[in-house]
Amino acid sequence: MEEPMDRWAGSYVVLITYADTIGDEGVPGLQALKSFVNRHLHAFAAVVHVLPFLQSTSDGGFAVASHTNLEPRFGDWSDLAALAQGRRLMADLVLNHVSASHPWVQQFMRDEQPGRSCVLAAVPDPCWADVVRPRSSSLFTQLRGPKGARQVWTTFG
């Protein structure tokens, strides 16, 4: 096993990209990305950081709908493993943003675990009016369930 200091070097070039940045009609995004990196960047990019690739509903992949399934247009887990061959792979672990269709939110709305513990309802507080953000959508979204209407933080709207 590598020592922690051997995992990264200041000389590494890191390619940061979305899985579908390289378009090749009819080819899953991760396969097209692997082909492009192998053909053009193999000698340079020691690390490929693939921005959110899990199944999502919006927000550039950050509104995660499933933490176990890849976005179908990107390919599947074997495509991600193939991209990792011969290089280091980096990914965002998006736990603090989920889609309303994510199982945790659906469980929260039914007052079931684990969603009940994963989604936090907001406690009304006048200080929320002081939150400044670069979005026009509401800071909170109302969800209805067995406990009635509850407000949850909405990062992206």
Report each predicted region and the residues it spans.
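Acidic/aromatic-lined carbohydrate-recognition and catalytic surfaces
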Residues: M1-G157
